[in-house]
Regions:
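Conserved lysine of the Walker
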Residues: 32
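Accessory nucleic acid-recognition modules appended to NTPase machines
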Residues: 205-379
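Domain-level recognition of nuclease-like catalytic cores that cleave nucleotide substrates
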Residues: 170, 416-439
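Interdomain motor-coupling "hinge/lid" segment immediately C-terminal to the ATP-binding subdomain
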Residues: 129-253
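Short glycine-rich substrate-engagement loop in P-loop NTPases that contacts/grips substrate
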Residues: 54-85
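Hydrophobic anchor at the beta1->P-loop junction of P-loop NTPases
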Residues: 24
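N-terminal pre-Walker A segment at the start of P-loop NTPase domains
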Residues: 1-13
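Hydrophobic positions on the alpha1 helix immediately C-terminal to the Walker A/P-loop
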Residues: 35, 39
Length: 439
């Protein structure tokens, strides 16, 4: 079974909660159900699980509930395990099929607080828009993402000692042990192909068969397309959203990687088109990276919501959509070819999984910074991502560091190199993005 950091997050909720239920959201196929089931079996004597898509009778019963008593009675009627106070986890899955159940959490935990409750579902960003209210103070939540790079390394049997070597090298800005550095670099190249979708990772780890891997990935891509058709508001929106989704690989291959709304459907109001882009983001399928007018803290103040790059939630799916030629090049370590979009997609999903908001900066006089992230203490970090050998060519980063009004102390280049620190620029191995959350 794949080791997921979300299990630690669930355990922390159980340890620290007072009366809150927990909502786990995230895109389809990122492993929510599996992790919550593992959590239930590990930390509780009993697990009562209702899936509102697999069990339409349970869905119908819950939809008819008007009170906490009605809801609990419906849960008990379809429970396949015992409801024992203090020893049972109640897991309601696919709650996007019954979003109003979330509004009843407050009354459920107040009336039947001797049980723990976890809700989960996909497309919650779109499916929960119409609910009456979300109970503030009675619902904790977090978002799950595909396996991050460290989780992928654990799936590939990388030792804790090797991971700690990377972490220590990052803390002390020193070079990683050469053997470990080579292993991590090779695994990062592999991660660009496999990505972090659990079904894809599991298939590759067990078989090392790229064809089996692509079957799993293509199945997920097809599922996302079906979800768009099923859950979009109308046929016109479904067609436009599917076109945006299918255009992501081609758009990321453009020099500026920015979406041009006119390429999707000419003549459509900008606000309508924005909603279609946001549908993919709300569903967890895509990761928008917004432009900022100034790379200064707080970045949100200068965000331009109508100018953004759009990445997929998983680099493996992007590589799958790009075709076998790209996979062959990566398998043959032909990283000299310009696959910057794949590298940037991997960096975007890693940063997002670790809680960073995603921004980039572009200015005619300075140029473009691939990513700009911020820390709570007011520190802004500009990041350049380099997939080729000329990683020390970064005029935009140099100009941004020299701009006194920005007040940026240090910049980072993520590249195919071991650690090098020169002046106010840190050249770090591209896989070391996994450590940024620890700074």
């Amino acid at each position: 079974m794949l080791r997921r950091k979300a299990l630690e997050r669930l355990a922390a909720w159980k340890r620290d909660k007072t009366t809150q239920a927990l909502l786990v959201d995230g895109a389809r196929q990122v492993g929510k159900t599996t992790v919550i089931e593992e959590f239930g079996h590990t930390y509780y004597e009993h697990l009562v699980e209702l899936n509102f898509i697999d069990n339409p009778e349970a869905l119908s019963a819950v939809q008819k509930a008007n009170t906490a008593d009605d809801l609990f009675m419906a849960i008990a009627a379809f429970a396949q395990d015992e409801l024992i106070p203090g020893k049972t986890l109640v897991f309601l899955d696919e709650v996007q099929a019954c979003p109003d159940v979330v509004t009843m959490v407050k009354f459920l935990v107040q009336r039947y607080g001797q049980y723990d409750y976890v809700f989960s579902g996909s497309l919650l960003g779109t499916g929960l828009r119409g609910i009456r209210s979300v109970p503030v103070g009675f619902l904790d939540s977090f978002t799950m993402y595909p396996l991050d790079f460290e989780e992928y390394c654990m799936a590939r049997s990388v030792s804790n000692q090797a991971l700690e070597e990377v972490a220590d090298a990052f803390r002390n800005r020193r070079q990683v042990n050469p053997a470990i550095h080579q292993r991590m670099t090779d695994l990062f190249h592999e991660y660009l192909i496999v990505g972090g979708m659990p079904a894809a990772v599991d298939a590759f780890v067990k078989t090392h068969n790229v064809q089996q891997l692509r079957l799993q990935q293509q199945s997920i891509v097809d599922q996302y397309r079906r979800d768009i058709s099923q859950y979009a508001d109308n046929l016109a929106d479904a067609r436009a959203i599917r076109r945006i989704f299918d255009l992501v690989p081609a758009e990321l291959n453009q020099q500026n990687k920015r979406f041009r709304i006119t390429q999707v459907s000419k003549g459509t109001r900008l606000s309508r088109e924005e909603d279609r882009f946001l549908w993919l983001a709300d569903a967890g399928v895509a990761l928008p990276v917004y432009n900022v007018d100034e790379p200064r803290y707080p970045l949100m103040l200068s965000m331009n919501s109508r100018l953004f790059k759009l990445f997929l939630n998983d680099v493996g799916l992007l590589t799958c959509m790009c075709g076998m030629d790209v996979i062959r090049d990566l398998l043959n370590d032909r990283t000299d070819i310009n696959y910057g979009a794949l590298y940037e997609n991997a960096i975007a999903q890693e940063l997002k999984a670790h809680g960073f908001n995603l921004f980039y900066y572009k200015n005619n006089s300075i140029g473009e910074l691939d990513f700009v992230i911020e820390y709570p203490h007011g520190y802004v970090r500009p990041i350049e991502v380099k997939s080729g050998k000329s990683y020390k060519r970064h005029s935009a980063l140099t100009k941004a560091l020299n701009a006194e009004n920005f007040g940026i102390r240090k910049g980072t280049v993520l590249a195919e190199t071991n650690t090098q620190c020169e002046g106010n620029i840190d050249y770090l191995p591209v896989y070391m993005v996994s450590q940024f959350r620890n700074e």
